[in-house]
């Protein structure tokens, strides 16, 4: 029996593990183990089938949840003859059709009662690694002091934490690296919080956080250089024209033009250069109740189907 595996960046990063077993009927049952704490979009493409009946669902293109996901089965034409199949795979963080609430009210990610001057960062005109482009690039900069606390603006599950770099603590605003926390929301959008002081994260991947919960400390040097909160919310958007992968990635990030709650102003989009005061009113903090849906959690066992 000959079985071959094609090119796959899944194995190098170990975020998604694809495996298959042969069942009692001789079928090859494929599954994917998602080690992340949010949904991923998985695509599997087969280039070779020898003595294998192609499954009508192929190429496989679907969301996989955290934990174990059963995918599909391949059946040999003649169980007594060798089989061969070659496939490639790719994945993207997020949902195929993200049900994002672009009118959601976010807290300012700073201490209640604290005042800050807000700026919109300019678009760097380049996409993040693995993306074809970014739409509506929108990142807020909040002037802070070193050691100030960063708070979660919305309920969600921590998906990534990076706080190992010390460049920003030496006063570098754009050091090429950025300490940050990423949090997944119930509508499959993601919040990015930076720039954290080295080793200052107060949360870890997989942790459920509530609105207004401390998640890290602001970096920067003793003179305040590099001391700012960079806050953005984005979600996955698929490009059907590029979905085959023949001309590049078929996914890109769309940024949400945030509606934030501030004291004396209420809900609204923040103006570049204006000064605002943070406030955590209960109505905003509790707008996502338990009954309205839970953020995605990683399962310890069982299967997602």
Annotate each predicted stretch with a short phrase.
Residues 160-176, 213-230:
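Flexible, gly/ser-rich surface segments that form the specificity/activation loops bordering the active-site cleft
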Residues 189-212:
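Short histidine-centered loop motifs in beta-beta connectors
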Residues 24, 35-54:
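Short acidic, flexible loop segments centered on an aromatic residue
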Residues 61-177, 275-305:
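Surface-exposed, glycine-biased beta-strand/turn segments
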Residues 1-16, 32:
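Bacterial Sec-dependent N-terminal signal peptides
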Residues 17-37:
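Short beta-strand elements of extracellular/lumenal beta-sandwich folds
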Residues 150, 156-158, 206-218:
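A structural signal for short beta-strand/turn segments enriched in small hydrophobics and glycine
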């Amino acid at each position: 029996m000959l079985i071959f595996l094609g090119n796959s960046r899944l194995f190098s990063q170990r975020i998604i593990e694809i495996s298959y077993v042969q069942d009692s009927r001789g079928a090859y049952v494929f599954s994917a183990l998602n080690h992340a704490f949010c949904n991923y979009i998985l695509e599997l493409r087969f280039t070779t089938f020898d003595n294998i009946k192609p499954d009508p669902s192929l190429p496989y293109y679907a969301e996989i949840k955290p934990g174990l996901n059963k995918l599909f089965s391949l059946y040999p034409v003649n169980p007594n003859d060798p089989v061969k199949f070659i496939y490639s795979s790719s994945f993207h963080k997020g949902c195929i059709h993200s049900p994002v609430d672009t009118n959601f009210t976010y807290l300012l990610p700073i201490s209640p009662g604290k005042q800050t001057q807000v700026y919109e960062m300019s678009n760097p005109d380049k996409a993040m690694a693995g993306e074809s482009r970014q739409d509506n690039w929108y990142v807020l900069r909040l002037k802070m002091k070193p050691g100030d606390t960063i708070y979660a603006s919305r309920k969600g599950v921590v998906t990534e934490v990076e706080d190992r770099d010390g460049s920003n603590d030496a006063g570098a605003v754009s050091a090429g690296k950025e300490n940050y926390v990423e949090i997944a929301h119930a509508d499959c959008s993601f919040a990015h919080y930076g720039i954290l002081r080295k080793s200052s994260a107060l949360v870890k991947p997989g942790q459920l956080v509530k609105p207004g919960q401390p998640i890290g400390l602001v970096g920067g040097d003793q003179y305040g250089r590099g001391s700012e909160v960079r806050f953005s919310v984005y979600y996955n958007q698929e490009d059907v024209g590029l979905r085959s992968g023949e001309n590049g990635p078929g996914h890109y990030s769309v940024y949400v033009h945030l509606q934030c709650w501030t004291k004396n102003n209420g809900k609204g989009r923040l103006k570049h250069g204006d000064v605002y005061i943070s406030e955590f009113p209960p109505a905003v903090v509790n707008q996502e109740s338990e009954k309205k849906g839970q953020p995605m959690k990683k399962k310890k066992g069982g299967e997602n189907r």
